[in-house]
């Protein structure tokens, strides 16, 4: 969510939220547009209910059409569905090989498999029951994105972020509504990540919300280990910024969140192993995944990913660059920053590091860019 609203935010937990000079200039430059934005941002909470209803209709209205056949169930989904079905029907967490129990192999991580298994338990085994899980996580991710953007930038910017994701064309195979129809890790990951940031906004002097933040990020870490370097960059980078400004209370909270998220993920993994003891076979190691997916230096792939990001999707890097300029422009204005400004910095670093990795190091699969694009909206 890189574009900041010119509407000053209410102070949070004793921090002073102040508009800056750029906001005043923007407001004076376009009074007609400003009045529309002001009316929207000051509207009653009924507008939020309308947005939530629209998202529900948009996600499920489009998602339930040909849910079993479009797109066809494919390799990545098949592993997860196989493990969830075998777990529900036979009690074995894995697949079958020639009728004998086998490891889960390339299935999605436990939170995704467990969600699909819960759907199978409630509604029976089938393709629509599988993909219903993806739709629920997709709706959750959109609602949390709206809630987060509304708190950080105002209602008008939150609605604009949703419009960008839903209406501005990406490659169709990675459109959130298309990915959300499938049993993949991206939408659950985004749901848990965004829930963590929403909880962090409420965590100042509130230990329960701090614990909720840690729990959400631990689930995100467990859902897709790919997020680890970017989440660490988001938190650690913000700690550096806050330490340079001498805001040590924020540095301490971020340190607790980062260490707690890692520890929480380890605890969840131990809990999973305890739960599945006697129902799972050892997972064979998969060598070479880092070189195949995460660190690729083939020139043709690098040119393709750079073209994707800066030619096909230029609004996202441009928006992040503008957000970085705004953050830099206000860095020395006050001794302490509000919790909103802290989260803005964290999201900027998270989305920026993710998209930089996609452009300059990834294997080039467009789906790898989706979390970064979603967060950059």
In which residue ranges do the predicted regions lie?
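Transmembrane-helix signature of polytopic, membrane-embedded enzymes
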Residues: 52-55, 145-172, 190-191, 204-212
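Extracytosolic helix-loop segments that constitute the early lumenal/periplasmic catalytic or substrate-binding loops
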Residues: 61-66, 78-114, 118
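Membrane-interface transmembrane helices that cradle and orient dolichyl/undecaprenyl
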Residues: 18-20, 156, 193-211, 220, ...
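Hydrophobic/aromatic-rich transmembrane helices and adjacent perimembrane loops
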Residues: 135, 186, 229, 345, ...
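Aromatic- and kink-enriched transmembrane "portal" helix at the membrane-lumen/periplasm boundary
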Residues: 67, 127, 131, 141, ...
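Transmembrane-helix motifs of polytopic, lipid-linked glycan transferases
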Residues: 53, 57-60, 132-153, 195
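Transmembrane-lumen/periplasm boundary regions of multi-pass, lipid-linked membrane glycan transferases
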Residues: 86, 232, 238-339
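Membrane-interface alpha helices of multi-pass inner-membrane proteins
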Residues: 199, 209-225, 236, 354-355, ...
């Amino acid at each position: 969510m890189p574009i900041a609203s010119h509407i000053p935010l209410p102070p949070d937990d004793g921090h002073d939220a102040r508009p800056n000079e750029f906001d005043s200039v923007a407001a004076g430059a376009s009074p007609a547009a400003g009045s529309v934005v002001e009316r929207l941002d000051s509207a009653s909470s009924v507008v939020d209910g309308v947005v939530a209803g629209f998202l529900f209709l948009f996600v499920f209205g489009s998602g339930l059409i040909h849910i079993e056949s479009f797109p066809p169930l494919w390799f990545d989904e098949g592993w997860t569905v196989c493990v969830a079905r075998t777990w529900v029907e036979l009690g074995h967490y894995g697949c079958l090989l020639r009728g004998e129990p086998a490891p889960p192999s390339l299935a999605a991580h436990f939170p995704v498999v467990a969600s699909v298994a819960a759907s199978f338990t409630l509604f029976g085994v089938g393709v629509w029951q599988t993909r219903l899980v993806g739709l629920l996580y997709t709706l959750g991710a959109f609602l949390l994105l709206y809630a987060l953007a509304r708190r950080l930038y105002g209602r008008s910017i939150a609605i604009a972020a949703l419009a960008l994701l839903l209406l501005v064309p990406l490659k169709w195979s990675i459109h959130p509504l298309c990915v959300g129809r499938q049993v993949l890790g991206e939408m659950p990951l985004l749901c848990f990540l965004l829930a963590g940031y929403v909880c962090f906004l409420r965590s100042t002097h509130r230990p329960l919300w701090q614990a909720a933040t840690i729990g959400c990020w631990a689930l995100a870490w467990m859902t897709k280990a790919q997020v680890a370097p970017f989440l660490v960059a988001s938190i650690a980078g913000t700690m550096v910024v806050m330490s340079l400004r001498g805001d040590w209370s924020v540095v301490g909270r971020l340190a607790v969140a980062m260490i707690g998220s890692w520890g929480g993920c380890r605890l969840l993994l131990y809990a999973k192993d305890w739960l599945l003891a006697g129902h799972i076979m050892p997972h064979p190691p998969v060598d070479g995944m880092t070189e195949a997916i995460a660190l690729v230096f083939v020139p043709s792939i690098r040119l393709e990913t750079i073209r994707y990001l800066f030619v096909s999707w230029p609004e996202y890097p441009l928006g992040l660059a503008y957000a970085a300029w705004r953050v830099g422009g206000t860095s020395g204005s006050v001794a302490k920053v509000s919790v909103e400004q802290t989260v803005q910095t964290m999201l900027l670093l998270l989305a920026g590091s993710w998209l930089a990795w996609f452009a300059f190091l990834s294997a080039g699969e467009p789906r790898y860019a989706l979390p970064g694009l979603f967060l950059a909206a």
